[in-house]
Amino acid sequence: MALKFAPFASEIELPFYTALSQLKIDHDKLDDSARPVLGLYEPRATQSPDQSSRMRVLGNALSSNEVPSGHIRAEGKIKNVNTIEDFKNMDKQAMLQTSAKQGQIWDAINDGTIYSIPSLLSSFTILSFANLKKYTFTYWFAFPALHSEPAWRKVEQPPKFSAEETTALTEELGTWRYSHDNREHGFFLAKRVYPSSEHPQDPESESTSDLPFKWVIGSLREFESGFFNGVDAKNQYVSFVDPSTYHENPGWMLRNLLVLVRRRYKLDKVQILCYRDNHAKRHVPQSLILILESIYDPEYQSTAPDQIPKVTGWERNSLGKLTAKVTNLAQYMDPAQLADQAVDLNLKLMKWRIAPELNLDAIKNTKCLLLGAGTLGTYVSRLLMGWGVRKITFVDNASVSFSNPVRQPLFDFKDCIDGGAKKAYRASEALQEIYPGVDSTGHVMAVPMLGHPITDEAATKMNFELLQKLIEDHDAIFLLMDTRESRWLPTVMGKAAGKIVMNAALGFDTYVVMRHGVTPEDGGPAALGCYFCNDVVAPSDLLQSVKDQTLDQQCTVTRPGVAPEASSKLVELLASVLQHPLKGAAPAPKLSSNHQSGQLEFDRDPPNHPLGLVPHQIRGFLAAYKTMLISGPSYDCCSACSPKIVNAYKEDGWEFIKRALTEKDYITELSGLAEVQRKAEAAANDVEWDSDEEGMEDEEPELL
């Protein structure tokens, strides 16, 4: 009677798809080489036949070799290709042939390595394509099976074991497995050994059962060392753990085991034990016993003796068709989790080809404080989220007005009703609506400004302390306010705390984007200056306040494209700073001559920086569509970042700030700017102008 085999059916746990996605994004990238994957199967006596023979792939199958109790391992490979066209165009038959031969089943049987890894007899291959944008996974399992020529036929089917025999066999097999590698657990030899006068049974090892024989279990390799010598054929069993529950049809891996029996054992008749029992129900016999025969006929042989036989094994669907399966993971995923993975996807794709050394975590884990939630603040926050930043905090004391939504992308019309929502609160809410995974909060407060008298000392001190704590709790501080004097205190605090301070300011068709110099870890002076280092006067209410300005001076009157351009360059500058080994202390790029063109160009520092240059300042001129990279050293008389100012702030804290806000010339005198001004005036007075004033009264003026 011809023998039919129960094929495997694949069963993938959902976490496996996530693990495969992460492996593709973070590690494999464009590499589509086959990777090992662990498969598991088990005898399921209670399963209906059509639900049996399941090859399970767990969530940790790509990273773990752990085999759960009661399961048998199978050696798998997965080839995750880069495009759906690669999947469609793959030569499926060649892939199946390769998975059955090269270093796998056929080669292992011929060279004997199958004895070390019998689990290869139940091996499988997965061809897959993961659409990481739509979370769909196209895959196709193959369970390579070598055909025997001529085919094995069932000549006899002995009765099942008794409950007592099954119990003894199960216990003996369990003992044997403890001392053997789990790759051997699915295939073994079993024999009945009856005591004789020459070989009496050892009383100490005698079983408590009343069976007249003892079960002995051996590895597949022991056949060649005489495991069955002296044992009657009816007591010899070449065995495998069978996941099939069909009454007459054994599991798929028996095909490969029978090829081993023919080529290694040189048998044309064999008794097969399809082991289907388990320890929990060992008193209920389930195993199937088959006596198979394959008469060798040289004329029937269709392949050369050393040529790999016919291979089949691609999985069929529930309708019996040879076709791939598609799983849509999006329907199983929490929307927030989908958003979380999607946000990171485009960033991680940068590392596949363009910037493999890009450190995305350095950007993602940077906590950003945005002082100002207006035009600059709203654009900057969106771009920070685009880079994957998860912590964004707003500080602003203004409300959304009707003129804001068209220029500030986090607000809309309803935010202007009833006096307008507070910008800081609404901006943080809007970020969370856009991406729930962001940690965003808003604080409504006025930043104490140099030159603005204190009207409520308690409230001003409270704002000072809150700002101080916020700066300490964040890594990068963005100065995005409307006025110059409002940037002074955060500049001092950021410098004292050693934070990265990013600054942007707008004109009608111009902008400046810059990073403030950070004091090196060795305590030396900062090489680069801050926003105030080019000033010869301290910021003050008399010069910079909006009180006495006309409407066009009070509003941010700029071309609409200036703010998004400045914001994008500011965020990209931060990303470049975070990729530099020195972070905020990175030097400005230096000019050198290009040997080929002869032109001056900025050097990338370091040469392998994944994002290019790390400039100090970028000045943009929209009217001419130009940008300039410039740098300026720190100024030892700067009103904000000079050592005298920073040290006074560190020593006296609020008292220093209180004095700076109330005494008009305190900062100018302390920083040394006042002395610079006096010396400049003295020098101007000392200049001798070369002019001849004598006789001028008598001369006629020249007529124009």
Swiss-Prot record:
SUPFAM superfamilies registered for this protein in UniProt: Activating enzymes of the ubiquitin-like proteins
An example molecular function term from Gene Ontology annotations: Atg12 activating enzyme activity
Key word Transport present: yes
Region ranges (Homodimerization): 660-699
Catalytic residues as annotated in Swiss-Prot or TrEMBL: C555
GO cellular component terms, A-Z: phagophore assembly site
Motif (GXGXXG motif): 372-377
Predominant location: cytoplasm
Localization: Cytoplasm; Preautophagosomal structure
InterPro entries: Atg7 (IPR006285), Atg7_N (IPR032197), Atg7_N_1 (IPR042522), Atg7_N_2 (IPR042523), ThiF/MoeB/HesA (IPR045886), ThiF_NAD_FAD-bd (IPR000594), Ubiquitin-activating_enz (IPR035985)
Transmembrane segments: none
GO biological process, one term: protein modification by small protein conjugation
Keyword entries, A-Z: Autophagy, Cytoplasm, Protein transport, Transport, Ubl conjugation pathway
Region described as Disordered: spans on this chain: 682-704
Biased composition (Acidic residues): 687-704
Changes seen on gene knockout: Blocks the autophagic process. Leads to fewer aerial hyphae and slower mycelial growth rate and fails to produce any conidia. Also reduces the production of sclerotia in cold environment. Fails to infect wounded cucumber leaves and shows only slight virulence on wounded tomato and grape fruits.
Annotated domain remarks: The C-terminal residues 660 to 699 are required for homodimerization, as well as the interactions with ATG3, ATG8 and ATG12; and the C-terminal 17 residues are required for the ATG8 lipidation. The GxGxxG motif is important for the function, possibly through binding with ATP.
Subunit text: Homodimer. Interacts with ATG8 through a thioester bond between Cys-555 and the C-terminal Gly of ATG8 and with ATG12 through a thioester bond between Cys-555 and the C-terminal Gly of ATG12. Also interacts with ATG3.
Function: E1-like activating enzyme involved in the 2 ubiquitin-like systems required for cytoplasm to vacuole transport (Cvt) and autophagy. Activates ATG12 for its conjugation with ATG5 and ATG8 for its conjugation with phosphatidylethanolamine. Both systems are needed for the ATG8 association to Cvt vesicles and autophagosomes membranes. Autophagy is essential for maintenance of amino acid levels and protein synthesis under nitrogen starvation.
Stated family: Belongs to the ATG7 family.
Alphabetical list of NCBIfam families matching this protein: E1_like_apg7
Protein name: Ubiquitin-like modifier-activating enzyme atg7
Source organism per UniProt: Botryotinia fuckeliana (strain T4)
